[in-house]
């Protein structure tokens, strides 16, 4: 068993379709069968099943292992129908052969969806009958859908025990492509819309998808009312159909599809079972293929969250995500306002790979309408930054074009996307409050997606909502403890308008940065941002809760423009005099040339000899990183226009002042190195190897004195 599971795990990594992942979808001869696309894996020991339970109502239920006998076949499909009386011919009203060709060849991208459409219509008919019988207080008959394949005859048959159709209904429902039987039925029951809203969409359109694969379509239908006659509807899709009374017709509807020569694969049982497993596993009614029950999965997103076990969640997650880990977070979200939504979302336990982060694919969430699959990966219902989320969304309000495959990009879809995004953000915020340590690990693994969301989203209010999920270390908190922007804002002193941050590779470099040192005099809390894209993220965010996000590097430049004064309280003998400082700055401007725009004095620094200031340094730094070709020092200087600010109290600056006249060659080496050190501290030098030669010269000069 262990060896088989390991082999299965390795094979499963190559799966492509999210909804063709491991799912116990059927049983044969007492052994669970694991369907993986078109491959089946049989376990040698029937007692070693991946799921337990024997009732169809249980998730991933299998036949009891103890039952050694093969389950008896159950089918209602038989050739009892016979045409009697005259045949009447009708032309499609306003639906010509050309229009039929459009529906059959252009509307659907995959021919296999005709099975999904016909199953949906059968479910529709059963739902109508159930509603009618319940309202009338009558006993419900067997509510079933049956499919039968016949490879010799090249046919596939689908039959339901639903409400059936009269002769007039056959003409109106199947004679007009654009007519919706379900819609008309709902209009007649508007006062009971809540009960009737479960009916699955447009019957007429779905029915005509059969002509993608059919040379001829036979329909036998009989209303559920006693003594009602049955009828045959027959057409080859050429623009004309025939109707005749028929005997031997069971209540409900039976459709026989005579397949085209290039579509004979749909007369193969395994091919049909693959399609049903892909699209219709969650239909509410029992679904049989050649006498065997094939839809054994339960739509757990429609259940009460209290009734779903942890095991069921794990198995369902593995099914929809083609995964082998467990979900770290589970959100079961149900609402009827402002939209009808039944959904389950999972966040994988496994850390995303670089492929997961960089891939251009959209959502990994499947979209259903009343438990019928619409899209395996619905790219429009979640924003791209949430592509790490796995799950299912089921909504009766989703607008569909004639084909269920072509979702309209409408205001309703955008509303659904906004509602789901806000609910997921709220869920993550709640999780951060519930278990901060678990959330911190989640943010470490998935924080890059949130940063992407802020950078790629245009609306400021949505940016700020996503920003509530960001976490950073802070100068006001111990190392390792994270804080949010909301928590930072709550600690701000009255009248403070800015949230300050500093980007550095780690806390040690942040705390020893000349820019953080310059902020200490203000006694202001500073967020420490360590990730590569934090700076770009905060530049795009700009503000949070009406407070500006300011890099401490930018704040220093702004202070200079505002000509804020910082008093130097050190004794006169410990610093250069004002005259010496002015002369030194003039010499440094000349020595550094075009590499600097200006040289100034600063009293913000204590342990650092100098620092570089650039207006909008974060944006400039990001721009330099994005350049394909390395730039020379002169080109960088022209772009950055840096100002070098010197600390007149520092030993290096005082020694430089002494050396500039006594040993000009050594002084030049020293001022070049002070400048380069400041550029490195500012993160404006990607490759420091160019300065190695100068450092060697400085070491030689230092050793020559001994």
UniProtKB/Swiss-Prot annotation:
Cell compartments where the protein resides: Mitochondrion; Mitochondrion inner membrane; Mitochondrion matrix
Family annotation (CDD domains): HATPase_Hsp90-like
Keyword presence, Nucleotide-binding: yes
Modified residues annotated as Phosphothreonine in this record: 176, 496
SUPFAM superfamilies assigned: ATPase domain of HSP90 chaperone/DNA topoisomerase II/histidine kinase, HSP90 C-terminal domain, Ribosomal protein S5 domain 2-like
Listed SMART domains: HATPase_c (SM00387)
Keywords noted in UniProt: Acetylation, ATP-binding, Chaperone, Membrane, Mitochondrion, Mitochondrion inner membrane, Nucleotide-binding, Phosphoprotein, Transit peptide
PTM-bearing positions, type Phosphoserine: 172, 196, 570
Presequence boundaries: 1-60
Gene Ontology biological process: negative regulation of cellular respiration; negative regulation of intrinsic apoptotic signaling pathway in response to hydrogen peroxide; protein folding; translational attenuation
Organism domain of life: Eukaryota
Residue numbers binding ATP: 121, 160, 173, 207, 404
Primary localization: mitochondrion
GO cellular component assignments: cell periphery; mitochondrial inner membrane; mitochondrial intermembrane space; mitochondrial matrix; mitochondrion
Recorded coiled-coil stretches: none
N6-acetyllysine found at: 264, 326, 334, 426, 433, 468
Complexes and interactors: Binds to the intracellular domain of tumor necrosis factor type 1 receptor. Binds to RB1. Interacts with SRC. Interacts with SDHA.
Family, as annotated: Belongs to the heat shock protein 90 family.
Described function: Chaperone that expresses an ATPase activity. Involved in maintaining mitochondrial function and polarization, downstream of PINK1 and mitochondrial complex I. Is a negative regulator of mitochondrial respiration able to modulate the balance between oxidative phosphorylation and aerobic glycolysis. The impact of TRAP1 on mitochondrial respiration is probably mediated by modulation of mitochondrial SRC and inhibition of SDHA.
Protein's name according to its UniProt entry: Heat shock protein 75 kDa, mitochondrial
Native organism taxonomy: Eukaryota, Metazoa, Chordata, Craniata, Vertebrata
